[in-house]
Structures are given as C-alpha cells and as structure tokens.
From Swiss-Prot:
Keywords: ATP-binding, Cell inner membrane, Cell membrane, Cytoplasm, Membrane, Nucleotide-binding, Protein transport, Thylakoid, Translocase, Translocation, Transport. The gene is secA. It comes from Prochlorococcus marinus (strain MIT 9301). GO terms for biological process: intracellular protein transmembrane transport; protein import; protein targeting; protein transport by the Sec complex. This is Protein translocase subunit SecA. GO terms for molecular function: ATP binding; protein-exporting ATPase activity.
Amino acid sequence: MLKLLLGDPNTRKLKRYQPIVEEINFLEEEISQLTDDELRKETQNLKSTISAELDLKKQKELLEEFLPKAFAIVREASKRVLDMRHFDVQLIGGIVLNECQIAEMKTGEGKTLVATLPCYLNALTGKGVHVVTVNDYLARRDAEWMGQVHRFLGLSVGLIQQDMNPLERKKNYDCDITYATNSELGFDYLRDNMATDINEVVQRKFNYCVIDEVDSILIDEARTPLIISGQVERPQEKYQKAAELSLELLKAKELSKDGIDPEGDYEVDEKQRSCILTDQGFAKCEEYLGVSDLYNPQDPWAHYITNALKAKELFIKDVNYIIKNEEAVIVDEFTGRVMPGRRWSDGQHQAIEAKESLKIQPETQTLASITYQNFFLLYPGLAGMTGTAKTEEVEFEKTYKLESTVIPTNQTRKRQDWSDQVFKTEIGKWKAVAKETAQIHREGRPVLVGTTSVEKSELLSSLLSEEKIPHNLLNAKPENVEREAEIVAQAGRAGAVTIATNMAGRGTDIILGGNSDYMARLKLKEILVPLLVKPDNEHKPPIPKQRSSKSKGGFSKKAVTNLKKNISNSSTSLFPCKLDEAFEKKLSVLSDELVKSWGDRQLSVLELDDRIATAAEKAPTDDNSIKLLRESLSDVKKEYEKVLIHEEEKVREAGGLHVIGTERHESRRVDNQLRGRAGRQGDLGSTRFFLSLDDNLLRIFGGDRVANLMNAFRVDEDMPIESGMLTRSLESAQKKVETYYYDIRKQVFEYDEVMNNQRKAVYGERLRVLKGIDLKRQVIGYGERTMIEIVDAYINPDLPPEEWNIDQLISKVKEFIYLLDDLKSDDINLLSIEELKNYLQEQLRIAYDLKESQIEKIRPGLMREAERFFILQQIDNLWREHLQSMDSLRESVGLRGYGQKDPLIEYKNEGYDMFLEMMTNMRRNVIYSMFMFQPKTDVNEKN
C-alpha cells in the first residue's frame, strides 16, 4: 500500500538524479570546445581548489558542487581517448557511486566505464582512490583500459600486482587512482601493520573505494578471513600416519539420528563440511595407533585424523585444488582461478599434502588477520558495482550500510531464458549439455558453458571431442590460464564453444563476432615475444591447434567415466584472417625497429605487455617506438575488423550468444550473473540451465523430498524431468543455502567485530610508534601506569598504613627499575596512596632521564631507536599470542550454549579481559626492557 501511495523508492531516487544529468548534458558542448591541454588544465584547477580545502564537510560540498563539470570532463576525455561516450544511465550510475551506494547494472551496460566518473571526482581531493577487482587480470585490464582516461586528464594511475616488491607497491599506492584486487589490498594492509620501519609501509590512509563485482567480494568471499601466517614446527609423521589410517576407515552411509551411531567408522556432513568419528571409529583409530586416548594433550591425534578424513572426503583434487609443481594449489571456488601462495590453515593443507604424497610443508600460526567486512569498512567512502545486488540488498545494508540502486538499461533486454532441464542422473545431464552445445554450434552461434570445477569442465571437453566439436577450455589449469586473453577474445565468434569454470566471477564481456582489439594485441605479441623477451622469461602465447578425435560419433563409456583425464585444448583459428605479404613485411620492419630501440631480448613478458597496452591507448606520447607500435596495432585491428564485422552480423542473425549453466549455484545471484553474459547491451541471446538430482545443491540441501523424488521418477537418464514440485524444491534449496551462508557470514562478522576494535587499538598504537610520535612520552606513560598498578596490587586501602606491604612493593618497583636501587621504605612510609603513586611516578621519570643520558652518550638518537624497537617487539609478540588465545577461545566458547549462555557475549567479555591483560603485559615488558637495555659499546670507543 505504501509503495502504491509513494511510488517505487528506486524510481524516486532516479528522478532526483535527473536534473544533475541534464546539467552534465548542458555542459557537454562547452567542454567539447576545449583543447586537450585545456582539459588537463581544468583538471589541475579543480584539483587545486578541492585538495586545498582541509575541512572534510566543506570538501564534500565542493565535490558535490563540481560533480557536473567533473563528469562532463570525464565524458569528453573518454570520447577522445576510448571513442566511448557515457550514456545518461551511466552518468546516473556514476552519481550513485559517488553517493557511496551500490549501483546494480546489468552485464554489458558498461560498469567499468561508469567507475571512471566517481574515481576522477574523488581523486581530485589528492587523497587517493582505490578501484577493486576480483583478480589480477581484471585489475591490469582496467588500469590499462580505463586508466587511459585518467592519464589523459593528467592524473596518475597505479596498479598493484601479485609479484610487485614493496617499493613498486608504495609508488603505485601513491598515485591518484590505484587498481588492485581485494586480496592484495587486504594483505598489504596487514603487512603494513607488521612493518618495523615507517618506510616499509606502502599504503596511504584510506579515502574512497569502488568495488567492481561487489557481491563477489563483500558477500561470496566474506566467509573467509585474510590471514598472514608464520611457520610452526609440527611432527610430519602424524600427517602421514593419519592419511594412511583414513584409507582404512569406512564412511557411514547416513548421518546419526536420535543418538544412534550409523554403521561405519565416521560420518560426513557435507552441509557443515565436517567429518565426525563414530564410537566404532574411535575404537578402530586407537587400536591402529596403539593409543588409549585420541585427545591426550601430550600425544594428540584427533585433530590429525579429522583433517585426514576431510582431505579424503571434502577436499577433491581438480575441484578444490590442483597439483602444480609438486604442490597442492588452492582453486578459488568463486572465480575458478588458482591461488598460488595461499594455504588452508589448522593443518588442513598438510593433510591434503599427505593424502597426495607430496612434501609436507610446515604448519602455520596466525600473525595477523582481518575479514573483508571489517577491512572495507575502514574506507570513509565505499561504493560498489554489480549486475546482481537486489537479492542481497538486506545484507549490504545491515553489514556495510550500503544502499542498492538499480540503474535502468540503455537498451531493452532481448535475452531469452529457456526453462531448466532436470535429469535423474549426472551422466544424463552431461550428455544433454553436449547435445545442445553441438546443436547451437552447428547453427553458427557462440556457446558459453559454465561449469563448477576443473573436473567437470574436462568431462564435458571429452564428450565434445567425441562429437568433433572444436572448443576452448578456460579453467584453473596453468596451461589454460595462460590462454585466457586469447580464449575470451574469440568466445563470441561464430560457432565458438567455450567451457569456463566459474565464468560468473570473471567479469569479462564477450563481444559478438570476436574482439578485434584483443586479437591485434595478441598478433603483435606473438611476433614480438621471440625477438624482445629474455629467454628465461619467454612465455609465447600458445598457437591454437585443431584437435582431432579418433572416435566416430556417439558417446563412449570411456568418455563418460573418465572424469579426471587431463585433456588438451582445442580451438578455432585465433586470428580471423591471414595478413598479406606486404602487411607481414611491414610488421617485420616494425620488429627490427623495436629491437634497435629496446634491445635484443631484453624485456620481461610483463614489460612487453605494458608497452603493447600503452600503444593501444590514444593518450599522447613522445616515444617514437610506441608511436610505431600504435600505428601497427591500429592497422592490424582494422584488417581484422573487416572480417569480424561480417561475422558479428552473422552471429546476431543466428541469435547471439547462448549460455549454458550446468549446475545451480548456492546463490540465485550467481546464476543470474552467468545468465547475464548473454544479451549484453540489447544483443540477442539465450540461456538454459541443465541440472541433475545428483547435483550438490539438491543432494545436500534438498532434504528427503528430493531423495523421494529420485526414487519416484522411473525415467531414463536421458529424459528431462519437468515438475512443479521439483522447481519449488530447487528454489527452496537455494533459499536455504543463501540463509545458511548469510548466517555464517553474520557470525564471522560479529565475532571479528570483537577482534576489530582490538585490532584498531593495537594498529593505531603501532602506527604512532612507527612514525616516532612522542616515543619518550609514550614509554613514560607506560611506566606511570605500571607504578599505579603496582601500588594497587600491593596496597589495600581498607587496611591502616602500618599494615601495608611496603617492602614487597619496593622490591617489585626495583624489579622494573634497577636505577631506583636506593629506594627505601623510610622514603614512602608516611605517604597516602595518592601521594605514593605520584612519588613513584616522579622517581620513574627521574630514573628514565638518567637512563636516557647514559644511552645517548653511546650514540645520539639510540634511545629513540630502542624505544621504537622494544614497543614494536612487545606489541607483535603479544598480539600474535593473543590471536592464538582468541582462536582457542572462539573454538571452546560454542560449548557454553549448552549452559544457557550466549557464546558471543561470553566471547566479547572474555576477549576484552584477555585484551586488557595483553596491553598491561605489553606496557610492563616495554618498561622492563628499556631499563635493562645495555647496548654493547665498541672496544675502541672505550679506549
């Protein structure tokens, strides 16, 4: 009723933005008359005015005042540099982002271009802007592509990549606009707060941040905290023994009910991702290991056995991890990408290494951690973009205080979403997927098939090979990751078939007919790598090969069952046409010129990529080599476009891109992301999901109803099932999972909120010390607090002064401050408690000045260095121990629910007490260390 009376709030909001859009449009003609240099001058004038205002409220008002002009400048720069003009709906998206909201824009509506508007405006404050993407590839692409606009206008653009050293990171963070992944930003923040010198700190104070694919980062990845670990020695033979034992144990066929153990040695709860030993299993393990108690603190085994069982049942090779260079490398469940350097904690990674007979790496201990929720809440200005935010609107608002606004599409959507096809068995489903893929391919339409794991993508690849359907595989396998740019460039070509693992998280648009710009870059890279790249750095882009199949039609039993076979990729010809001899000759001349300028095989692959990317820009350059490269790129692109424009028309006429989903995701939002790959910007397209009753979602969360359905449907595996009850079960299962994971994220957030307040206090103290701000006053403050604590511990105000334990008090003071060796009870016997505290504090200050004069004689400035060293040492050591204690507390506090106590409140109260104790110990240890500090002097100095 309220909605009917007041209208849709989203529509009301969009109407409010309309006058601003009209003002930007009004300024367009005026701004278009300016020369390139005048545009840059306008930027400098705006930056000088806005950055000079130190009052935050007034600065915000200035940003609002200059928004129309700033957006008009960016629009004009984009037209000149990218040949792309912001539509009115994209301007609305920019306004929404500037107001620190989430802009929901459908796939292909130009989210990446929209981000240039608020990023430019907020960069004018001079405080820096971060643009966050889900992976290195997208960060690099956006910095190269959209960075052209900002560089053209005179702003500096930085990029953070995984392999950068601290100096490179600092330089890039100091830029006006910096592109980075969420994990790189988070880990740099943690590393900065472990730095021992202010020069090691790479990040500036946070200002404004735009997150691309915001739901992927703030929702999907919010269950996993960022952790920096240090190594801890643990007995490796226990992991090996537990792995051997796990193979001897039998899995129970069902979970226990009403306290009765099922038959078997252990139960697997896939929903909770846990393995639990039965009574029979406990007995079997104790007998096998020759021990009487698996939980014996002197010789614990339970933790190792549980991890070994989880490695056996829940961590699957080529799904959760792959083996690369004799190491188990994690595969990101949301993006399908490998995450080298990341390891599971609590001994789980070691259990997987034992299972796969790999070298077992030392176990780790947490040194620093933070959740994505609390990390991104550190930004005063936070905004995000996604194609699907409304399904998680409540969580965005509750956790992050972020409103969501749906931005209208520029063109009407023409995509058709075909009804789901559900099969009784997984094999039936995969056969149907292969059949529909082959059919659409023969119609001349491109097909994108989304799979959930490396294993499944390779099964489908083998089925398509038997049908002689050429296709590309894009998954976490290293040989496929290297070809990502090539695969995406041609995924929209006529009849192209692309199998992608978790494509929904990749954030890459597929252009109908193929991407001529990418293809031109790849062509030049293919020619230049052998001539310009150092031999040890050489990674030539693989030349696509057509793979033949010995099979003659149909599906062999081998193809269906061989899920884990490592399959080579097939591909259509990458380049749309062969360049003629004159063209090849021209490219040969270019190669010779570049070798003269840049040296024979002197560059790394990344350096060559950078130069090709710079050449692809339209920004002005004085580098003749870049000019030559730019000219050649443009010529190759035009040649390819001549062919691809006809191919684009052909694909449009055939019906556009067809997207196939092979499993419902845990979240409806991710299903919608995958669907959104088709029908971008008003293109034609279609989508369909193929499901089976064996799929994880239905099997784990569907409950007994789905199990009964499986028995009820007496149909062939090749026959699709259509049932209203089944559709409802599917929707119900997805809602259950969304609620289940929301509760987990909420719990992670609530528990980390306790740690977050402590983290802020510790990191704030640490930063003051690193900057060397009032170090002496800080240490004296620690000492004064310690004197008060000693008096409170040894003097009981309820007792008369003659009964006070003055001797023990003096003894304790001397433990901390040996320079007060001549302190006697006669000096303080007649003092009141307050006078006693003041007297001891005064004596501490005198002793500290005396200590300082001794140390400074050895070398001026040494006392300040010692203060910084000891404070940082104590903070780091005690914080590390505190993190371990808090982890243990969190694990144990859950059991208090059985005693009618709220575990979270218990965690907050005990955690707070533990934190106060840690800070007290830190102060006392620093004071003790400072007075005991006796630097070694050079023998020659003494003489």
